[in-house]
């Protein structure tokens, strides 16, 4: 038996990185999956490798698009049990508050903050209709710590996701809907590797602050998401669920 047998999961940002890993792992564990992404080709590639999944094109910043994704999933599988709100962006023009444009700020907030809001707004009613479920909102360790090398819009967006998750957890606790903020540390994703590929010295500067001395593998983060999606976490809600290799615990790291 799989840990998610009989569950229906909506996963955004499923075209790559942690979203893709989640779609494959959740499907392996028995779930039926909506693999949603703004890039339909990438979503279809993920769905094709999963045991039971379908691809759906979604713009999480667009309300009609999010509503259509939830409705399509519920119609196909007769309901929804798990929301894995993973889609997010971290553009290169998001930097210091002194340099980041209002346009860049708004673009990040639209996807990272508004996107999670819309997925919860239009997804939670489907969970309520099933008698409960699990919402996993992907925040970040930067919602806990500040950074001298700033991505001000991204950091603010992830702080908003963390606060939103706590409030939703309290609001829906007695209706058996659990809401948790998954806070990954730095993860070996194409996006992050491309950033460090242009500046290898930046990777080495950061490595000194990671207790493990390495980036997380996407599957290591998604294993935490699997726990939150499963009934094993039935008494876990409102949590700041850190999977960060000890980063937020560190004052100094090993020599």
Predicted region positions:
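Canonical Rossmann dinucleotide-binding motif of NAD(H)/NADP(H)-dependent dehydrogenases/reductases
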Residues: 3-34
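Active-site helix of classical SDR
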Residues: 120, 157, 165
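Substrate-binding pocket helix/loop in short-chain dehydrogenase/reductase
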Residues: 94-97, 101-106, 206
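Short C-terminal tail/terminal secondary-structure segment
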Residues: 90, 94, 226, 237-255
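Residue(s) in the substrate-gating loop at a strand-loop-helix junction
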Residues: 140
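Alpha-helical segment proximal to the catalytic Tyr-Lys
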Residues: 125, 170-174, 234
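A glycine/serine/threonine-rich, flexible loop-to-helix segment
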Residues: 99, 150, 174, 186-210, ...
């Amino acid at each position: 038996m799989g840990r998610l047998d009989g569950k229906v999961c909506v996963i955004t940002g499923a075209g790559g990185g942690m979203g893709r890993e989640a779609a494959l792992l959740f499907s392996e564990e028995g779930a039926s999956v909506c693999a949603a992404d703004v890039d339909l080709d990438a979503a279809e590639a993920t769905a094709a490798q999963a045991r039971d999944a379908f691809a759906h094109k979604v713009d999480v910043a667009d309300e009609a698009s999010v509503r259509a994704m939830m409705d399509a999933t519920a119609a196909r599988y007769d309901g929804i049990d798990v929301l894995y709100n993973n889609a997010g962006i971290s553009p290169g023009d998001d930097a210091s508050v002194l340099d980041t444009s209002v346009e860049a700020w708004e673009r990040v907030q639209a996807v990272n903050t508004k996107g999670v809001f819309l997925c919860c707004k239009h997804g939670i009613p489907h969970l309520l209709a099933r008698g409960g479920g699990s919402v996993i909102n992907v925040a970040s360790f930067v919602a806990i710590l500040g950074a001298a090398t700033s991505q001000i819009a991204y950091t603010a967006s992830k702080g908003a996701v963390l606060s939103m998750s706590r409030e939703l957890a309290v609001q829906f606790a007695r209706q058996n809907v659990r809401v948790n903020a998954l806070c990954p540390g730095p993860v070996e994703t194409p996006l992050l590797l491309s950033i460090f590929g242009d500046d290898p010295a930046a990777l080495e500067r950061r490595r000194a602050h990671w207790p493990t001395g390495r980036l997380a593998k996407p599957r290591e983060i998604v294993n935490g998401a699997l726990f939150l999606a499963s009934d094993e976490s039935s008494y876990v809600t409102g949590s700041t669920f850190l999977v960060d290799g000890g980063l937020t615990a560190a004052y100094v790291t090993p020599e």
